[in-house]
From Swiss-Prot:
Name of the protein this chain belongs to: GMP reductase
Native organism: Staphylococcus epidermidis (strain ATCC 35984 / DSM 28319 / BCRC 17069 / CCUG 31568 / BM 3577 / RP62A)
Family in the record: Belongs to the IMPDH/GMPR family. GuaC type 2 subfamily.
PANTHER family named in the record: GMP REDUCTASE
Record GO biological process: purine nucleotide metabolic process
């Protein structure tokens, strides 16, 4: 079995058929809607909040609201629907979450997207939650995860998941691989490739991306959508504390199972870091779109599907060739 990650891969160009990269279309259909980019910010407290969720929806980007303010979820769904926008929320698998789904159904509050957000998603509890949502809210698009194996993808799809999220601990602020010895850190792109071979429904590649070029690589190896944390963190609009160190501005960024998120030092699988302030999120999204348009032009196409068939080489961690600090 070939094992590789993002840094090990270079995609091989095809003949360009466009006059300008602006002719290339980066939009993606995901569930009932079409979005400008195949990218979603991680549903983490230092990446996503209600104001950003609303802005993303208004501007035709996909988002997933995190689940760490449970009591705010019903008002959030109402607010989004009142504004004529789609609602995309997260749930866990504890007993109160099953009751929450029933409450949504009895109130006729139907989020367009529901993400079951668990670190180890190949589990009976997630399978039971998928079935529960599909029973009570059959029109909601259910994203389930996270998994790292073809078996996990198949079981969640068979339970009724409309999409699966692939990635166990490859993110910058996730230390699952260190604390447990398990995960897809260091071989996330291979894991995505294997899972894609088993998938019949869309996959979200979650974690491990460090550059915009990694979006194109994710699509090449099977992702329909890519979830990104660190590249979206530390913007002007991002949640999180801003600090100044040696004349430079930084913003905090922490993992979803860190003690900073949990409020206690127990079962910690995330850490906190400060990321240099990156300016406007809108500028980053524009740059991301332009870079992906360039990727499509190198693939010899005009849309994302051209990326799925390009050849590649495995270069074993040499693609930065001294260009990285």
């Amino acid at each position: 079995m070939k094992i590789f990650d993002y840094e090990d891969i270079q995609l091989i160009p095809n003949k360009c058929i466009v006059e300008s990269r602006s002719e290339c279309n980066t939009s993606v259909k995901f569930g009932p809607r079409t979005f400008k980019l195949p990218v979603v910010p991680a549903n983490m407290q230092t990446v996503m909040n209600e104001e950003l969720a609303q802005w993303f929806a208004e501007n035709d980007y996909f988002y997933i609201m995190h689940r760490f303010n449970e009591e705010n979820r019903i008002p959030f769904i109402k607010k989004m629907h009142h504004a004529g926008l789609f609602a995309s929320i997260s749930v866990g698998v504890k007993e109160n979450e099953f009751n929450f789904i029933e409450k949504l159904a009895s109130s006729s509050l139907i989020p367009e997207y529901i993400t079951i957000d668990i670190a180890h998603g190949h589990s009976n509890s997630v399978i039971n939650m998928i079935k529960h949502i599909k029973k009570h809210l059959p029109n909601s698009f259910v994203i389930a995860g996270n998994v790292g194996t073809p078996e996990g993808v198949r079981e969640l799809e068979n339970a009724g998941a409309d999409a699966t999220k692939v990635g166990i601990g490859p993110g910058r602020v996730c230390i699952t691989k260190i604390k447990t010895g398990f995960g897809t850190g260091g071989w996330q792109l291979s894991a995505l490739n294997l899972c894609n071979k088993a998938a019949r429904k869309p996959i979200i590649a979650d974690g491990g991306l460090r550059t915009h070029g990694d979006i194109a690589k994710s699509i090449r190896f099977g992702a329909t959508m890519v979830m990104i944390g660190s590249l979206f963190a530390a913007h002007e609009e991002s949640p999180g504390e801003t600090v100044e160190l040696d004349g430079k501005k930084y913003k905090e960024y922490f993992g979803s199972a860190s003690e900073y998120q949990k409020g206690e030092h127990k079962n910690v699988e995330g850490k906190k870091m400060f990321v240099e302030h990156k300016g406007s999120l809108k500028d980053t999204l524009t740059e991301m779109e332009q870079d992906l348009q360039s990727s499509i032009s190198y693939a010899g196409g005009k849309d994302l599907k051209s990326l799925r068939t390009v050849d590649y080489v495995i270069v074993r961690n040499s693609i930065f060739n001294g260009d990285r600090d």
